[in-house]
Structures are given as structure tokens and as C-alpha cells.
Amino acid sequence: MGRNCGWLTAATAQEYRSRLKNRKFLPSFLISKERWDIDAVYIPEIKINIKAESRRLKKRMDEKDSVNIFLSEGAGIESIVSELESSGQQVLRDAFGHVRLDEINPGQWFAKHFSKEINSDKVLVQKSGYFARSAKPNKKDLDLIFQSTDMAVSCALNGQSGVVGIDEDQDQLQC
């Protein structure tokens, strides 16, 4: 969700880790926090050194027998495109010249690549886009929605046009 924007993946990973603190684990049954924890978060804003990550994840796999990765859909695109094109495959692009992410499927590419590099027998890729787009809004979402609409109406009634959103520097709603 967001070709070049990893904030949702990063925020989801942060929320996931905070929820792990409240879970009960049974290490004697191989159900430990470490096995459920995140080993990597890949977002488009940060370049991924695939070779170095493969080595790091192999080490994690050897230590805990599993690897959990949160991947933003636009992460690592340059590496994927480079590999595909160097092997003679055509990379399809949309009318704007953007790589068609649904065609190259970054999640599957990373799964295939890393499973080979870390000697994993099983791989599970869960694409959150469908769940995120269809999820019921939580209280935090609803509060932001109502605050945004209240501000938008207030600005419109005062003759002020623009876009309503949270100012990242001041962490407040602005128009």
C-alpha cells in the first residue's frame, strides 16, 4: 500500500511488536517471543543490501529456526528489477513508467530469494493490503477521521482551501 511509502509497514511492525509484550508464550513448547518477533522490516525509503541481509537472516534462521519479515510493497524494487532484467526477463511498466508491482510480486520474490539463501523449507507470504483496505477502523482511526472532517468543514466555512492532514513537524492537524 504505497509504492514508495513504507510508513504503513513500519507503523504496523511497531504496533505488532508492542502487542507481543502482552502475549503469553510457552518457550518449553518452542513458542517463544523470539520466534514471533520481527527479524527485518523492509521499506522503500531504505536501500536493502540483499547479500548482507541474506547472511544476517541466515544467522537468525540458524539461531531460532524461523525468520519473520515485514515488507512494504515497494521495498527492494531496484534489486528485483535489476536481477530480472539481467536474466533477460522483461519488466512490465504502467503508462507512467512505474514497474507493475503486481507483475513482479515483491513478496514472492523476497520469499523465493531468501528461502534459498537461508535454507528454508517452508515459506508463508501474507499480503496485508487486502486486510488493511477492508479492515474496520479502530478508535484511533475514527478519532482522526472525525478531527479531519471537523477541520475540513471549519476551513471551508472560513473560505480556506487546502488539504487537511497532520503536520509531521508539529504533530498537529492543519489545513
Kindly label every feature range from the protein language model:
Residues 1-121:
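Accessory alpha-helical/coil subdomains and C-terminal extensions
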Residues 83-175:
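C-terminal non-catalytic interaction/assembly regions of soluble proteins
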